[in-house]
Structures are given as C-alpha cells and as structure tokens.
C-alpha cells in the first residue's frame, strides 16, 4: 500500500470527525503534506452525541493541527435522522437506506470545506468516505465524489482536488493503513465510531460491528504473515 507520496509544496484540508476513518486520513495527510500544511475542518451538524466533537478536538490538539469548527446544525431542523435524534432507534429496513443516513450531509460538508479552502488558497480536500464497506450511503460512492468535485470547480471557478484515500479499502485495509503509518494503537484508543455515543464503543451498533470486525480480520491476517 503506497502511503508516502511527499507533497510538501501543497496544503490540504481534512474533513475530520474524530472517527477511525477521518483520523487515519489525517495521519496520512500529515505524512504526505507535512503537519504544517494540514488543517482540519469539523462540522457540528446536530449529532446526537457530544463525544464525537470532543474526540475530534482532543485529537487535533494532541497533534498540533489547526481545526475549524463549522455549525451546520440547521440540518436538524430540516431532516429527521437517527444520528441527530437521541430517541431514535438505529435500524435498517430491507431494501431501504439505514436510518443513520443523513440526506445531503457529505454534499454540504464538501461545499463548506471548499468555500473555506478557497479562502485559504487550498485546493486539496481530503475526506474519509469509503465505497467498499459503505452501508448503502449514496454520498459515499466514488461517482458522487467525482461529480461533486466537478460541481465545486464549476461553481467557484477554482481547481479543487477531492481526495478519498479510503474509497476502495475494506475496514481491515483501513486498519492496515493505520498500522503502516505507525498509528494503529493511537487510532484504536483515541477515535470514536460508535453510533450510541459510548466511550470505547457499544460493540453492537453497525458502526462498532464494522470497526471491530475489520480490526479482528486485519490482526488475524497480520498474525498469519508473521508466523
């Protein structure tokens, strides 16, 4: 897995939630661009658990990365979703999108990230969306990202480059990438992925299951290679 492609003459902004995927992307960006050329942008969209924002803030402070927090909580007033409703039960009905899907969220995040990036003279926008393990989320697909990239370039007459380093990686391969970057233990300990907002994860929600299954698979594969 090619993770080091020095690009220290450019700057990049990472859409950062404090979860496993965006934290892995943040570390890869630091390796590629240099810490001094990286910024993080985090969105307060009305998520049901404050721990997400707390983890994101703690990680960027620990790493010495500039973070910009954008309030997009108006989303909570115009769409209903289990990730923004503390009383909602997380579920997925057959042949339907899971109720954790937030309509328009990634489109909005990319739009705001692009507006901010252009103001800072930054062209590269990094996001941790992934098509391989995606839970049916249409805005995690490569075709959406490519379309959004073209749209933003046309809308602002600016050459953005939306990068998705995890797009075709399984969750096990994402853990492998973190390990190759030397931060597997850090990602495992400091990131938050749980839909239920439980420190260390509930182990039962779809996000925890995917995360834990991927880690177990990677560690098993790694153990076999080391035998």
Swiss-Prot record:
Binding sites annotated in the UniProt record for ATP: 16-26
Entry's EC annotation: 6.3.4.20
Pathway noted in the entry: Purine metabolism; 7-cyano-7-deazaguanine biosynthesis
MF terms (GO), sorted A to Z: ATP binding; ligase activity, forming carbon-nitrogen bonds; zinc ion binding
Reaction equations catalysed: 7-carboxy-7-deazaguanine + NH4(+) + ATP = 7-cyano-7-deazaguanine + ADP + phosphate + H2O + H(+)
Keyword Zinc: yes
List of residues binding Zn(2+): 194, 202, 205, 208
GO annotation, biological process: queuosine biosynthetic process
Similarity-based family: Belongs to the QueC family.
Protein name (database record): 7-cyano-7-deazaguanine synthase
Organism of this sequence: Haemophilus influenzae (strain PittEE)
């Amino acid at each position: 897995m090619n993770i080091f492609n020095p690009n220290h003459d450019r700057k990049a902004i990472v859409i950062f939630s404090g979860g496993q995927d965006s934290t892995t992307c943040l570390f890869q960006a630091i390796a590629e661009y240099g810490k001094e050329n990286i910024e993080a942008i985090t969105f307060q969209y009305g998520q049901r658990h404050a721990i997400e924002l707390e983890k994101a803030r703690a990680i960027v402070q620990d790493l010495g990365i500039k973070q910009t927090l954008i309030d997009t909580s108006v989303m909570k007033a115009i769409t209903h979703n289990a990730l923004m409703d503390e009383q909602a039960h997380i579920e997925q009905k057959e042949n339907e999108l899971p109720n954790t899907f937030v309509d328009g969220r990634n489109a909005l995040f990319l739009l705001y990230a692009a507006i901010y990036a252009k103001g800072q003279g930054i062209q590269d926008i990094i996001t941790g969306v992934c098509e391989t393990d995606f839970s049916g989320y249409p805005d995690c697909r490569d075709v959406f990202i490519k379309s959004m990239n073209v749209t933003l370039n046309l809308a602002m007459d600016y050459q953005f480059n939306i990068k998705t380093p995890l797009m075709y990686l399984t969750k096990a391969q994402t853990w492998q990438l973190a390990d190759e970057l030397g931060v597997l233990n850090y990602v495992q300990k400091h990131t938050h992925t749980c839909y239920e907002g439980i420190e260390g994860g509930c182990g039962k929600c779809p996000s925890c299951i995917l995360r834990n299954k991927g880690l177990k698979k990677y560690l098993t594969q790694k153990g076999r290679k080391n035998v």
